[in-house]
Curated annotation (Swiss-Prot):
Cytoplasmic side: 148-157
Keyword terms of this UniProt record: Cell membrane, Disulfide bond, Glycoprotein, Membrane, Receptor, Signal, Transmembrane, Transmembrane helix, Transport
Annotated protein name in UniProt: Receptor activity-modifying protein 2
SS bond partners: 50-81, 66-113
Glycosylation sites: 67, 112
Biological-process GO terms, alphabetical: adherens junction assembly; angiogenesis; basement membrane assembly; bicellular tight junction assembly; calcium ion transport; cellular response to hormone stimulus; cellular response to vascular endothelial growth factor stimulus; G protein-coupled receptor signaling pathway
Organism: Cavia porcellus (Guinea pig)
A GO molecular function held by the record: coreceptor activity
Length: 157
């Protein structure tokens, strides 16, 4: 067992002694931080354009914001716009900015929407009783049938 662990321990020691080479990532510099900040700023500007286009579409709707068939197209367009812009700037999606825009959308347009679900109630007692007693009565019948059929096959063999 110790022989199997020896290569793993050597690899772990190498990773601990040379962490930068094992990760194969250059050290971040102030220039890379500045360029990343510019990318995020550019993406934020693009996200604001997506948001403005979405708001324009939603303002055309007459406050029927809880009907999914009405709002699905502008909502999907917003999500697609945020995703495409994230890809343009080589950012992942979803990302914190996109999540913030979508969260703001939900707060602004969908905060008064609630999922309408029918209230479930118990069936009438006679139906409930039939649903309980029917399987209870069928169990002895099926047990008898299985035992009878299994005895018939034992006699033939």
């Amino acid at each position: 067992m110790a022989a199997r662990l020896r290569p793993l321990l050597a690899l772990l020691a190498l990773a601990a002694l040379c962490p930068q080479e094992t990760l194969a990532q250059p050290l971040p510099t102030t220039d890379t931080w500045k360029s990343e900040g510019q990318v995020v700023d550019s993406y934020e500007a693009s996200a604001q354009l997506c948001w403005a286009d979405y708001r324009e579409h939603m303002d055309l709707l007459e406050k029927d914001w809880c009907n999914w068939t009405v709002i699905s197209r502008p909502y999907s367009a917003l999500r697609d716009c945020l995703e495409v812009e994230a890809e343009v700037f080589s950012l992942g999606f979803p990302n914190p900015l996109a999540e913030r825009v979508i969260f703001e959308t939900h707060q602004l347009h969908f905060s008064n929407c609630s999922l309408e679900q029918p209230t479930l109630c118990d069936p009438p007692e006679d139906v409930l009783l039939a649903m309980i007693i029917a399987p209870i009565c069928l169990i002895p019948f099926f047990v008898t049938l299985v035992v009878w059929r299994s005895k018939g096959t034992e006699l033939k063999t």
